[in-house]
């Protein structure tokens, strides 16, 4: 948040006070308890050996809380950060648990990942839109990750990345059987 270093100590106090006031009603709306219980059920069942959870926006926040509480890998896309609110959940989450089990992807100009303090493993990605709502779009974020993490040639870009968000079309490899334009019916 703007002036985060100045306002965050005050936010911690406000979050603590609000949690104390709303403790009873928060139990009824604590979706993270359901997701954490479900993941723990899967872990105990023994049928799954490698469980991970992911989510976008508020679902990403739930994924981060569940991952830290259940000790599984969790990835949030455009999720609000959980460092400031980690003491408001039951059981509380330590900073070490957040840093060991969670990863948040934060697009430029997306307001949701600006909420709270980021944990150590937050990856900032570009967003070339001036509209912050567009920067919250999961499809745009996926295109940015494919574009920036792919190679210069043969990067795996969806047709929508080119047509909807203006990413350059990938080059066809020398032995390619069809062009990007042919594959996307452009």
Feature names for model-found ranges:
Residues 54-59, 63:
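Gly/Ala-rich beta-loop-alpha elbow adjacent to hydrolase catalytic centers
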Residues 64-68:
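Short, hydrophobic alpha-helix immediately C-terminal to the catalytic nucleophile
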Residues 55, 78-79:
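Residues that line or immediately flank small-molecule/substrate-binding pockets and catalytic motifs
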Residues 72, 79-186:
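Serine hydrolase/lipase
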